[in-house]
Design a protein with these regions (language model features):
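Basic, polyanion-binding surface patches
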Residues: 134-232, 316-320, 324-326
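Short Pro-Gly-centered beta-turn/loop motif in secreted/extracellular proteins
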Residues: 94-102
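Short, acidic Ser/Thr/Gly-rich low-complexity loop/linker segments typical of extracellular
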Residues: 50-90, 189
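Netrin-like (NTR/C345C) domain of secreted extracellular proteins
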Residues: 213-327
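Glycine-centered loop-to-beta-strand initiation motif
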Residues: 27, 83, 87-95, 128
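A short, solvent-exposed loop/turn motif at the edges and junctions
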Residues: 102-116
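Extracellular beta-sheet/turn segments enriched in Thr/Pro/Gly and aliphatic residues
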Residues: 119-138
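A short, amphipathic beta-strand motif
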Residues: 23-31, 66-69
C-alpha cells in the first residue's frame, strides 16, 4: 500500500525528472553575409508550420467558429517566446526546450539549419552561422508581353516554390507554381487542356488559389507564363449553362466606368459559409448581391464571366498595356 508520504516523494521525483528534461539553450545566431541579424528566427520543433498544416490548411463549411479559434491561437503562437526566439543586436538568443526537441534556425535568403537539443547541449558554446543561398546575376525581360490568355479554369494545384535568388535584387513577393485545367477560353485561345504558370504574391498564398473555379488572366513574357498579379474572379457554374461571379463586379476595380450588367443569376444550390468564406477566403457579402440567414449566405446577383472580362479590359489590363482605346 502506497502511503501519503511515499506518494509525495514519488510525485516530487517525477517533477524533478520532468524539470531535468527542460534545458535553456543560449548562443549566437549569425548570417555569414552581413554584420547584423535582421530576419533570424529560432523556432521550437517548427511549431508554426505544423500548427498551420494541422488546423488552418483547409477549413470545412460549418466549422467557422473552430477555424476562428485556431486562427487566434496561431496568432498567439507566432508571438509566443516559448516557441519562437529572435536574436538581439549582438546576435544572442535564448530559448527553453526539452531534450527530445529540435530547434529550427532560419533567416531570409539563407539556408535553414535544424539541430537536436540533445546535440546542442554537448557544445561548450553555441554559434550557428547561416550560409547565404547561392545567387545568380539578374536577367531582366525587356520585351512586352507576347500574349495574354483569359480563361475559366479549375484548380489542380498551387504550391509554394523557392524563387531564384538574384545577387543584386531583393524580392518582396513569394513565388508559387500553379497548375489549372482549362474549362473555357475567353481570350487568347490557349492551346491545351491544362496550363502551368508562375504567380507572385506579396501577401502570401495567392487569393485565387482559395477557389475551385476562377477566371484567370495569364500573360507570356520572354517565353514564360505568369499570372497577371492579383487579377482574378472566383466564378461558379450557373443553371443556364454559363459561368458567373456573385457580388459587386467592381469590388476589385472601383474606378471602372463601363456599363456592366448586374443581374439576378441562377446559381442553383450554391451557398457560402459566412465565417469560413468571409475570413479564410476573404469574401465580402453585401446586399443586394447576397441573402444572409445566420451563417448561410445565398448568392443572388452578380455578373457573367464575359462582363467581368470587360471590366478588366477597361481598367487594370488597359493600364498594363494590353488594350488600346479602340479595343
Amino acid at each position: 500500500m502506497i502511503t501519503r508520504c511515499t506518494l509525495l516523494i514519488y510525485l516530487s521525483l517525477v517533477s524533478l525528472f520532468a524539470a531535468a528534461q527542460r534545458v535553456q539553450i543560449s548562443g549566437r545566431l549569425k548570417e555569414s553575409s552581413v554584420q547584423s541579424m535582421s530576419f533570424g528566427r529560432i523556432i521550437l520543433n517548427d511549431t508554426l508550420q505544423k500548427f498551420s498544416k494541422a488546423y488552418l490548411a483547409s477549413p470545412e463549411p460549418g466549422e467557422g467558429a473552430k477555424f476562428l479559434e485556431h486562427y487566434k491561437e496561431f496568432s498567439k503562437l507566432s508571438q509566443d517566446t516559448a516557441y519562437i526566439a529572435r536574436p538581439d543586436t549582438m546576435h544572442r538568443f535564448s530559448i527553453t526546450a526539452d531534450l527530445k526537441d529540435s530547434l529550427i534556425f532560419k533567416s531570409y535568403q539563407h539556408i535553414t539549419q535544424r539541430h537536436a537539443v540533445s546535440d546542442l547541449i554537448k557544445k561548450d558554446s553555441i554559434e550557428i552561422i547561416l550560409l547565404k543561398q547561392p545567387c545568380l546575376p539578374y536577367q531582366n525581360c525587356d520585351q512586352p508581353a507576347e500574349k495574354l490568355y483569359v480563361f475559366i479554369a479549375e484548380k489542380i494545384s498551387v504550391n509554394y516554390a523557392r524563387d531564384t535568388l538574384y545577387c543584386d535584387r531583393f524580392s518582396m513577393d513569394s513565388k508559387f507554381d500553379a497548375s489549372y485545367k482549362i474549362i473555357k477560353n475567353l481570350y487568347g485561345d490557349f492551346k491545351g487542356d491544362s496550363i502551368k504558370f508562375t504567380a507572385y504574391d506579396h501577401y502570401g498564398v495567392p487569393a485565387f488559389s482559395h477557389h475551385k473555379y476562377v477566371l484567370l488572366f495569364v500573360s507570356k513574357y520572354c517565353g514564360k507564363l505568369f499570372h497577371e498579379k492579383y487579377q482574378y474572379f472566383d466564378v461558379y457554374p450557373t443553371t443556364n449553362g454559363r459561368w458567373a461571379s456573385p457580388g459587386d463586379p467592381r469590388r476589385f476595380n472601383s474606378s471602372d466606368t463601363s456599363r456592366v450588367q448586374i443581374e439576378k443569376i441562377p446559381f442553383g444550390t450554391l451557398n457560402f459559409d459566412k465565417i469560413i468564406d468571409g475570413v479564410y477566403h476573404n469574401m465580402t457579402f453585401t446586399s443586394p448581391y447576397f441573402k444572409i440567414e445566420g451563417n448561410c449566405v445565398e448568392p443572388i446577383m452578380g455578373a457573367y464571366a464575359e462582363e467581368l472580362f470587360e471590366i478588366k479590359k477597361k481598367t487594370v489590363l488597359k493600364a498594363r498595356g494590353f488594350f488600346s482605346e479602340k479595343q
